[in-house]
């Protein structure tokens, strides 16, 4: 048997394992799958049509509403769990978003909860929660999209602390979701699981690296799930599927025993946080994990903190920074329109004002460069080695990470220099913030995120310039949906006014999407950010904003 056939056979074994965990009555025939894939902008409605009205009522609800129904005994844990398992199975067969299926285990636990109902229900009792693949769950794989890590189920001792917390809170873990191999790409693809499509518009990528989460939640296959973010991996899929996604300050949600690429990298670290359809659910979840579980007791990297789950009242003389552009890449007309809507609302509200947030383009470039340099500091050796173990071919989306003919890995001294540059850049941004008069220093900043979606294979035609810098700065950032693209209103961008070749590429790609009409109706995603540790502030302001828009 050749190496080539061996890796392909192992891929098929993994796909067969996944497929075997879907009930026969939930499996779609090829004709139906093709029909749903071709109706690219109507997946939610089409999945609704395949589910019962009671299932749709459950899956289109919120955590808070389902909790109330459970408390009133209007719904059982089994009914809720079965509804989400069924819907997740249907969605997966169209967009390919699941890496591990635990339907049988979830339904057994739901039945146990119904038979052993406590007098006071734990905060997430009976609520199905989805997990990005890298979260370790006893009895199932954590592959990170690498074929060589499949068929190696985790033990009880390897289970992630956050998973243990979810169990303590009463949640029901029912699926893990797809990631790009290594998780170091914004497009969710692997040889093992294939390609994950956007559930709002199947013409586009789901984003990454928490693409499976974004696609599943976007189509109501889960109310809330956990993702991670080292360079937009929560915010990009959230933006692309019209969701709320929180990249917290480092040390908020425990990363203990969560598998990762580049483990041990402390400069520009990855963080773990929720993606959700409903902002109140997201805030409630964070308050449960932080206030009740107190992760700092067990995870030495977590910081004591109280998370505010409900306040939306803002203090007097509230200041909002509006970031219309970094001087390197111009945001598209849809983002400008959404930013202007937010700015006008703030300025019309008594006791609030908007100011322009305009850090220098030189600082923006440095922050972007630092993130990229950190990502390839080992010249891609870790990624390359993982692929070589199984013999699977390196994916095109990862070739920018593997410097075949480039420089050698950073020396210790070069890494120290990079770390120093990160600190200096963070301080320069703090200095810019302090340069505002005290009465005009922004409490939060509203910024573009992804600018536009991309078609499968077009990952490198978009930019992360409005995303990566907040990882370098360790600013909390909340992705928020603000309307949708209107091809007639938003229109084309002027490529003759491009600031540089990259800007011209972005403008040209935008024009292609507008002229094709594919992008019409696509969610517009912005992000609310604030200086380090102000996680409460970004959520509080977003709650206020959505009570007004």
Curated annotation (Swiss-Prot):
Reactions that this protein is recorded to catalyse: a monocarboxylic acid amide + H2O = a monocarboxylate + NH4(+)
Enzyme's top EC category: hydrolase
Keywords: Hydrolase
Catalytic residues identified in the record: 132 (charge relay system), 209 (charge relay system), 233 (acyl-ester intermediate)
UniProt-listed Enzyme Commission number(s): 3.5.1.4
GO molecular function, one term: amidase activity
Family of the protein in this entry: Belongs to the amidase family.
Protein name (record): Probable amidase
Natural source organism: Saccharomyces cerevisiae (strain ATCC 204508 / S288c)
Gene: AMD2
